[in-house]
Amino acid sequence: MVSMTKWDEIRKYTSKKIEKNLEIVKLDEKYIPRASGFKYYPMVIERSSGSRIWDKDGNEYIDFLTSAAVFNVGHTHPGVVKAVEEQIKKFFNYTMGYLYVEPPVRLAELLVEITPGNFEKKVTYGFSGSDAVDSSIKAARAYTKRVNIISFLHSYHGMTYGALSATGILDPKLKKLLHPMGNFHHVEFPDPYRNSWGIDGYEDPSELANRALDEIERKIKELNEDVAGIIIEPIQGDAGVVIPPEEFVRDLKKLTEEYGIVFIDEEVQTGMGRTGRWWGIEHFGVTPDLIVSAKALGGGMPISAVVGKAEIMDSVPVPFFVFTHIGHAVNASAAIATINVIKEEKLVERSEKLGEYMLKRLRELQETYPIIGDVRGKGLLIGVDIVKEGTREPDRSLAQKISWRAWEKGLIMITFGKHGNVLRIAPPLNIPQEDLDKGVEIIEESIKDAVEGKIPDEVLKFLRAW
């Protein structure tokens, strides 16, 4: 727990107005367990609109985090607000476990329409990416009558027990304290920039893809082909926006078909237009068996979904998809509105266009600052890999200093990645061009200050990060 004295010391290192924020920060540390998250800055959200947020002290920020890629349509979008208000006036919710409810059925129609696959599909719901991952695991096991699940090192799938067990980014020693479920197996993800095989995946993507596929097939055979599902983020998000070779994803799908394994496409972060496609998997020309969606689906309201082949979804017996508030009417109404906003405002196309622009701008910075080792992304899901100059060695502390200075200058942009050294860029898909440009300007100023040693090491003690 950070002491009162430590927070009193913060005035030595920042001139930012944060007195009202600190009141809540101290209460948070008193009442909320530390396991509830990483707190990057001593700021408390007071209100938000579009691509901007304001804290308790009235400081205004451009939001490049969007609550961890939740607000694809921007904060408090009028269309989403209207849908929520209209549904609340009718009724909050009634359990789908016993009666029929219209909004989740209408939402299912839309999800079936916008997901890949020209076959009959069905949809089940939850409240977070974590529980949706759990539901996808249930479906894979019920359908195949097998038990083992293969996922990837440095993946992030959530914190319910099934999702936690599938997640590969956590410190194994810490994870072991919670006794994760058995029958989960992790293999290496083909990271083109930094992998254990020493392969430059940008220069030789085929070699990287084949090395990873060989490891997966060995694992399948080691498990006597008793594998129910392989769960994959088409682009690893919290690992630092890691994009595998296209042929890897295509050949992985072929491998699952060969062995009768369910291909689970985890789109919690990459879905809903974030990568310049409705779903990240569409960059690879692959049709999954199951798609997991959450985060941006509800436009800020908590809802998740698993969309999958009808025969797989119907293999799960009653009542194993039931939650009391499954398909919550208010949240489902928000999700319907969110999908309609993305369609009407052409945000998928906008994400692709702005993403290309951002990659160009950030790669121009890379030419100036050798501490930028790699810039990668699709659409408006972008990672900037901060390294020790002249190497590929991650520089986590420097990345955190850049993030801190950006906050001081009015930009919310945290760090993440398997080494904690990647700048996370995921603004709303409808962010105004001027906000995008101002954000890049702040990033450059913050990098310059960090490189020139203008950000003291002491700020790191106020920043809890990946």
UniProtKB/Swiss-Prot annotation:
Thermal characteristics: Shows extremely high thermostability. Retains full activity after incubation at 80 degrees Celsius for at least 2 hours.
A Pfam family recorded for this sequence: Aminotran_3
N6-(pyridoxal phosphate)lysine found at: K295
EC number: 5.1.1.10
Regulation: Inhibited by hydroxylamine.
Family of the protein in this entry: Belongs to the class-III pyridoxal-phosphate-dependent aminotransferase family.
Function statement: Amino-acid racemase able to utilize a broad range of substrates. Can use Met, Leu, Phe, Ala, Ser, Ile, Val, Trp, Tyr and Thr. Is mostly active with Phe, Leu, Met and Tyr, followed by Ile, Thr and Trp. Has weaker activity with Val, Ser and Ala. Shows no activity toward Pro, Asp, Glu, Arg, His, Gln and Asn.
Subunit relationships: Homodimer.
Protein name in UniProt: Broad substrate specificity amino-acid racemase
Species: Pyrococcus horikoshii (strain ATCC 700860 / DSM 12428 / JCM 9974 / NBRC 100139 / OT-3)
